[in-house]
């Protein structure tokens, strides 16, 4: 067996007296991919921040050995010079700069006199992308011209330009399509063959199984186990992550479905940058009291834009007729929607769901502050009671209610956003990608909440790119393709293949006579 490239022993990290890491061990060998698994808040990101120099030497206890020698890093620059490079879940690219400029950001090739040698950077950027077998990216174009999948590959090229020996990938596929994810996994396999080591952090255990040689599981800041992937099952990894076995991820129980509560008619949304293009084209649907409506479709199909239009949050021009309990609504903003009894947990919680500078508690009560106001003053005690009750209800983990929400894990941020929306007492709750970047334990909690709300008579609209999630939750499935309704199915024996087949159809294609109908 080859000597370890990296050895971390007994890593301890405190935040204001709260132990985020409590004696964590991690070993990585050249050309090995180690899966780092744990629930949200388990300490995965904190451990990687220690390793990558975000938390410099001296701010934590323990030992790190790199290539057989102690690693003493005062910052990210030191670890990158050593060959340790992290690619964060939120990509660190400058949209307005070219691909080549992003790849060399902070490591520019310069001419005598200090001017950038742009031609040399373009040549080297081409070489790096060729090494990754990528030919669909023009290095002279701005990064903003490319989607999430290509941007992830640009980040990997940027890491290789820093001569990475160990690549840390933090939730690398959270915003990728299935095809883009497969391409990413192929590149990870290729990097392993070239001797580059990887630490792969993902809640998608099928990806961990596909590329990882070893799995290290941590829970509540402690090391649980390190085992070869071949000796593990998905069920065993989950049990180690959460400390218990999750037998039924979708605890479906009978619930009564009542009358139509929300009806959307002829929803049309125009593209923000190209108003002649329609992102949503004349879509109509309804949802009943106590019903869980799943909304499926390919990435870019217009699902999010449709939900934003109903919630009064679409940034471009749109037209729609929205009725609540048979009465027309005039929704011009999210505040109008909330007053009408419609709440929404957005797809991008960091941009649209939280105020990062505020504490967890103040984020939770942001939509209902008037409830605690008397003569212009907030009843702080009543507000705190509501915050604590909400956090307890959804098991939001935070050292104290007014810790900045930006410091929470993704899963706890998501549960805080859910808590905020539930405080509005909605009749209709829209959940757009509710479990993106969320661990399996938090997923199970969110699913239990969805079914509990349905039993209480709340109408739920769940938008998800995970077809297993749609089929596990929904009573009925609406399929959107190219901004149009491609199918509306009762979830009784419905399959993923049927949903995908519907998503790939356009209205024009459906209108054409088939060979069977022509005979």
UniProtKB/Swiss-Prot annotation:
UniProt-listed InterPro entries: AAA+_ATPase, ABC_carbohydrate_import_ATPase, ABC_transporter-like_ATP-bd, ABC_transptr_XylG, P-loop_NTPase
GO cellular component: plasma membrane
Topology in the lipid bilayer: Peripheral membrane protein
Matching PANTHER family: CARBOHYDRATE TRANSPORT ATP-BINDING PROTEIN MG119-RELATED, XYLOSE IMPORT ATP-BINDING PROTEIN XYLG
Function in brief: Part of the ABC transporter complex XylFGH involved in xylose import. Responsible for energy coupling to the transport system.
Reaction catalyzed: D-xylose(out) + ATP + H2O = D-xylose(in) + ADP + phosphate + H(+)
Enzyme class, UniProt record, top EC level: translocase
E.C. number(s) listed in UniProt: 7.5.2.10
UniProt binding sites for ATP: 38-45
Source taxon at top rank: Bacteria
GO molecular function: ABC-type D-xylose transporter activity; ATP binding; ATP hydrolysis activity
Alphabetic keyword roster: ATP-binding, Cell inner membrane, Cell membrane, Membrane, Nucleotide-binding, Repeat, Sugar transport, Translocase, Transport
Sequence similarity: Belongs to the ABC transporter superfamily. Xylose importer (TC 3.A.1.2.4) family.
The keyword Metal-binding is annotated on this UniProt entry: no
UniProt domain ABC transporter: residue ranges: 6-245, 262-507
One matching Pfam family: ABC_tran
Name of this protein: Xylose import ATP-binding protein XylG
Complexes and interactors: The complex is composed of two ATP-binding proteins (XylG), two transmembrane proteins (XylH) and a solute-binding protein (XylF).
Location of the protein in the cell: Cell inner membrane
């Amino acid at each position: 067996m080859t000597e370890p490239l990296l050895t971390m022993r007994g890593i301890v990290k405190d935040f204001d007296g709260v132990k985020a890491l409590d004696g964590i061990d991690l070993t990585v060998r050249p050309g090995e991919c180690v899966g780092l698994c744990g629930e949200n808040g388990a300490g995965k990101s904190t451990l990687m921040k220690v390793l990558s120099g975000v938390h410099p030497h001296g701010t934590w206890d323990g030992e790190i050995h790199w290539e057989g020698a102690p690693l003493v890093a005062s910052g990210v620059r030191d670890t990158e010079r050593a060959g340790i490079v992290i690619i964060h879940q939120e990509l660190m690219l400058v949209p307005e700069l070219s691909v080549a400029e992003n790849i060399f950001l902070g490591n520019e090739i310069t001419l005598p006199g200090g001017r950038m040698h742009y031609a040399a950077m373009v040549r080297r950027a081409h070489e790096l992308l060729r090494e990754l077998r990528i030919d669909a990216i023009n290095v002279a174009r701005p990064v903003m011209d490319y989607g999430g999948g290509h941007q992830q590959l640009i980040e990997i090229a940027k890491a290789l330009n820093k001569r990475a020996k160990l690549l840390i990938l933090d939730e690398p596929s959270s915003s990728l399509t299935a095809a883009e994810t497969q391409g990413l996994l192929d590149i990870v396999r290729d990097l392993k063959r070239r001797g580059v080591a990887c630490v792969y952090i993902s809640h998608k255990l099928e990806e961990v199984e596909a590329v990882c040689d070893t799995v290290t599981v941590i829970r509540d800041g402690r090391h649980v186990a390190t085992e070869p992937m071949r000796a593990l099952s998905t069920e065993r990894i989950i049990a180690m992550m959460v400390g218990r076995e999750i037998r039924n991820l979708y605890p479906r129980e009978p619930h009564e479905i009542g009358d139509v509560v929300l009806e959307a008619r002829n929803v049309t949304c125009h593209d923000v940058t190209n108003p002649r293009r329609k992102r949503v084209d004349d879509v109509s649907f309804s949802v009943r009291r106590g019903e869980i409506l799943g909304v499926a479709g390919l990435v870019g199909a217009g699902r999010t834009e449709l939900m934003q239009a109903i919630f009064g949050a679409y940034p471009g021009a749109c037209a729609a007729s929205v009725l609540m309990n048979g009465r027309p609504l005039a929704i011009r903003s999210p505040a109008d929607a909330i007053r009408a009894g419609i709440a929404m947990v957005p797809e991008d919680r960091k941009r649209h769901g939280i105020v990062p500078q505020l504490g967890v508690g103040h984020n939770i009560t942001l939509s209902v502050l008037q409830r605690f106001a008397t003569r212009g003053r907030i009843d702080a005690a009543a507000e705190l009671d509501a915050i604590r009750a909400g956090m307890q209800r959804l098991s939001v983990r935070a050292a104290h209610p007014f810790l900045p929400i930006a410091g929470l894990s993704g899963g706890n941020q998501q549960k805080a956003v859910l808590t905020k929306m539930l405080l509005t007492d909605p009749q209709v709750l829209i959940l757009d990608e509710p479990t993106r970047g969320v661990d399996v334990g938090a997923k199970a909690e969110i699913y239990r909440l969805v079914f509990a709300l349905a039993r209480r008579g709340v109408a739920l609209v769940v938008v998800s790119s995970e077809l297993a999630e749609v089929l596990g939750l929904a009573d009925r499935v609406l399929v959107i393709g190219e901004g149009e309704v491609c199918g509306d199915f009762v979830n009784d024996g419905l399959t993923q293949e049927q949903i995908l087949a519907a998503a790939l159809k356009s209205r024009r294609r459906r209108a054409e006579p088939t060979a069977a109908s022509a005979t």
